[in-house]
Amino acid sequence: YADATANADIMADRSRHIIMRYLAAQEAVSDWANTAAYCPARFADGTLRSAQARHTARLMAARLTINIAQPTLSRCDGIDSFDIDADSLSAMSVAEDQSGFAMEVFAARSIGHATLDISDRHKTTSQRLISFSGAEDTRAKTYDVAQLLAHPDTIVDSATGLFAPTDAVIEMNCARSEIAAVESSSNSTSDSAQSRTTAENSSDDSRQQSLGILTSMIADRVDLALTWGYPSFDEALFE
């Protein structure tokens, strides 16, 4: 956490040379992701700030004429399981399914930045999450998008009251729902006991690995929303 805040301060300091700020932003991406993974109480803060640092680094890279990859939604590729409870994984699968459906509808109408590939990535992630959960599949598969279609370009984000591009709000709402699901997970908290058995330490390692994967996955959604024009200042991202 200390490294994350230090690099974030350098990143935001306009009196510093842009190269120093760019390098600090890159470091902040991983520092904040590690904060989310190793300190569950800071999962939301770490995930959102990691995505914010990604976005800042990308903007600085453009000014420095450095080629940097555009955000791509991860799909839990190569993952066998998550040490997160079934209810939380199920809730995340619903969030991905909703976003996938909305993106499919938008792509069919050539609205915003939506593509069928983005829709498929959401839906693939949704299917994998519900499979990992082992829970009953409660996904509706189709959802009411009338409000989104009534405001295809910009819409008021109900979470902040701010106007933002509609496709970006879809991605941001997906991320917020997933963060809430992880934070409510019965497996996401750690105790402060001084004595640890090997099994307990192994369990902690498993949770940290799971949270690390999830923070990166969710940050992808936030990063994409920011790239599409969702406000990146703190008041828009943090409660």
Model-derived features: where do they sit?
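All-alpha RGS (Regulator of G-protein Signaling) helical domain and cognate RGS-like helical scaffolds
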Residues: 1-239
